[in-house]
């Protein structure tokens, strides 16, 4: 028997391309409006959902650590980061984390408002049958600040990092959702 094989459906389960960064997406139909595109990205996006664990046996003499019955999830850190190549006042306000827009002026605020937390989506192509992988960040807040990197004879870049948040009303809800659709709906 040879062990250097791959599953016969491997190429049907690949995520393809850079995907699109959105403000809204409808996973039941696999659709979005052009106006929902947050901005053009360069280099795709990076997503991580990392749990923090506690072990109830930790700190107890003679207790065995890493028993599955004593392991608990303390919290989740959910982040999405990347680089935008396009910007407008709406996305600039969002990148600030806390801000307001007045015509063409974007002002940073010293306090957070509930409207500073927004839902964001990343959606990428999946397989060869029109499928998608979608990641929904719930109550996302820009935690990477506002950054611009200009370049001689090139386009400017706006690095971003968003962190998803639970809320007091739903403290046990992990603030992201993952959808994998083979057919696009």
Residue ranges and their predicted role:
Residues 50-52, 85-89, 125-129, 140, ...:
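Generic structural motif
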Residues 1-92, 139-157:
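Solvent-exposed edge beta-strands and adjacent loop segments
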Residues 8, 54-60, 108, 115-118, ...:
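Intrinsic-disorder/low-complexity regions
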């Amino acid at each position: 028997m040879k062990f250097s094989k791959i599953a016969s459906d491997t190429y049907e389960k690949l995520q393809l391309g850079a995907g699109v960064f959105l403000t809204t997406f409808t996973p039941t139909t696999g659709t979005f409006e052009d106006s929902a595109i947050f901005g053009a990205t360069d280099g795709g996006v990076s997503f991580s959902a990392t749990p923090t664990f506690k072990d109830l046996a930790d700190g107890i003499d003679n207790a065995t650590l890493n028993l599955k019955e004593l392991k608990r999830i303390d919290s989740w850190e959910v982040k999405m980061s990347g680089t935008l190549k396009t910007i407008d006042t709406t996305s600039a306000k969002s990148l600030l984390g806390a801000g307001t827009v007045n015509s063409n002026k974007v002002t940073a605020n010293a306090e957070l408002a509930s409207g500073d937390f927004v839902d964001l989506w990343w959606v990428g192509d999946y397989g060869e049958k029109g499928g998608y992988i979608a990641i929904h960040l719930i109550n996302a807040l820009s935690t990477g600040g506002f950054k611009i990197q200009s370049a001689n004879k090139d386009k400017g870049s706006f690095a971003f990092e968003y962190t998803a948040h639970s809320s007091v009303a739903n403290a046990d809800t992990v603030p992201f959702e993952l959808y994998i659709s083979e057919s696009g709906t």
